[in-house]
Amino acid sequence: RIGFDPSWLGDYRFDIKFDWDTAGNSIEFGDFEGMPKWQRRMQIPQQNIRDAIISMVSVQGDTEFASVEQQNHLLATAPTEYDKKSALRIMCEEQRHGWQMAYLLCTYFGEHGVREAAKLLERNAQEGTRILGSFNAPIDHWLDFFCFTHFIDRDGKYQLKMLSTSSFQPLAASMGPMLKEESCLLYTSPSPRDPI
């Protein structure tokens, strides 16, 4: 459903990446501060917390896949080869982030997680079925793309930083590599007041 020529990917690989060192071993905030981070679903002490983590992972994955669906048609009308390659790299990394979230759901949350991961692939931005409305809006031309990514990628950086302190260690460990890749996304539209 991404819709671009696979040969454009070059040697890019959709690997699952973790940074366990940066994720830390202790919960940093809240009622469970100082306790070991949860590494498995059944270590999470309350069902409402498990549900909230599944929801956060699902929304994050949904936005990653949605942005690729929303923007991939622009590759055919890129103003320059540099713009095309930059947009393609953004789309590859966003797609990888979506796969990372699907991996977390399938690996750590049993049948419920598998169902939620399947929904990530069933929803589609062109059909207007993504969770967040801004990812269902059409991106019709490159000016839309530049403006959208300028603001959304900055918001995404703060969202990933927030998730990097998750009490669920696999989610926190996913954020280090995603933040490194997000810095490339931000580089495509930095402003003097927003250091990367």
Predicted regions: what they are:
Residues 74-85, 159-177, 193:
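Inter-helical turn/loop segments and adjacent helix faces that build the functional surface
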Residues 141-147, 158:
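Active-site-adjacent structural elements in folded domains
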Residues 91-115:
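Carboxylate/His-rich catalytic cores and anion/metal-binding grooves
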Residues 63-70, 97, 152-159, 185:
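Amphipathic, well-ordered alpha-helical segments in soluble domains
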